[in-house]
C-alpha cells in the first residue's frame, strides 16, 4: 500500500 489507504 501507499501513504493513502489504497492497496
From Swiss-Prot:
<feature type="disulfide bond">
    <location>
        <begin position="1"/>
        <end position="7"/>
    </location>
</feature>
<keyword id="KW-1015">Disulfide bond</keyword>
<keyword id="KW-0964">Secreted</keyword>
<keyword id="KW-0872">Ion channel impairing toxin</keyword>
<protein>
    <recommendedName>
        <fullName>Contryphan Li834</fullName>
    </recommendedName>
</protein>
<dbReference type="GO" id="GO:0090729">
    <property type="term" value="F:toxin activity"/>
</dbReference>
<comment type="function">
    <text>Its target is unknown, but this toxin may modulate voltage-activated calcium channels (Cav) or calcium-dependent potassium channels (KCa).</text>
</comment>
<keyword id="KW-0800">Toxin</keyword>
<dbReference type="GO" id="GO:0005576">
    <property type="term" value="C:extracellular region"/>
</dbReference>
<comment type="similarity">
    <text>Belongs to the O2 superfamily. Contryphan family.</text>
</comment>
<dbReference type="GO" id="GO:0099106">
    <property type="term" value="F:ion channel regulator activity"/>
</dbReference>
Amino acid at each position: 500500500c501507499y501513504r493513502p489507504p489504497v492497496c
